[in-house]
Regions:
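Acidic metal-phosphate-binding loop of nucleotide-sugar-dependent transferases
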Residues: 1-2
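Acceptor/aglycone-binding surface of glycosyltransferases and processive sugar-polymer synthases
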Residues: 5-86, 113-123, 127-130, 144
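Phosphate/oxyanion-binding loops and surfaces in catalytic or ligand/nucleic-acid-binding neighborhoods
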Residues: 53, 99, 136, 140
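Catalytic donor-sugar/metal-binding loop of nucleotide-sugar-dependent glycosyltransferases
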Residues: 57-58, 80-84, 93-111
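Secondary-structure boundary/capping motif
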Residues: 70-73, 101-102, 136
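DNA-recognition element of transcription regulators
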Residues: 90
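C-terminal, non-catalytic tails of nucleotide-sugar-dependent glycosyltransferases
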Residues: 131-149
Length: 149
């Protein structure tokens, strides 16, 4: 995926104006401009729906990859993050959400540059993300690892 870096200025402005502790790019934002395959849109929508149910995240898209954090927010949870791979940023957002940090979604301009519609993601990657998601659910909702001490 191509995410033009000039988008970052608007994200930084939201952090500077104290409107958010975390600003993330969202393909689901109404003002996003997307060149994105239908199969990926369907898979993404299903996964985001699952995340909303499991974690009560007030965001529609966790996986776009463009994110900005206030240093103090990220420092407060980074030692708690155990996940590697594609679900890493989900765990970060869940941990921040558990600690009541403000997460704001911003539109993205995205050009999908892969021909087959799936890019580098393989079935084993998808299965690993689901496995990691359940581990994050366990840490967040059963063990309550991300709550403030």
């Amino acid at each position: 995926m191509d995410l033009p870096p000039e988008q970052l200025e608007k994200y930084l402005e939201q952090l500077k104006n104290n409107r958010a502790d975390v600003v993330i790019g969202s393909k689901m934002h109404k003002d996003s401009e997307l060149d994105y395959p239908l199969v990926r849109r369907i898979i993404s929508f299903g996964y985001y729906s699952m995340l909303k149910i499991l974690f009560h995240l007030n965001v529609k898209d966790t996986q776009t990859g463009i994110k900005m954090f206030r240093a103090e927010a990220l420092k407060s949870i980074i030692g708690l993050v155990k996940t590697k791979g594609f679900a890493y940023d989900i765990e970060i957002l869940v941990a921040l959400n558990c600690r009541k940090y403000r997460i704001m979604e911003m539109p993205v301009k995205l050009v999908f540059g892969r021909e087959n519609g799936m890019g580098r993601i393989k079935l084993k990657d998808i299965l690993q993300v689901f496995s990691d998601t359940w581990k994050i659910f366990w840490r967040a909702n059963v063990r309550k690892d991300y709550r403030k001490l």
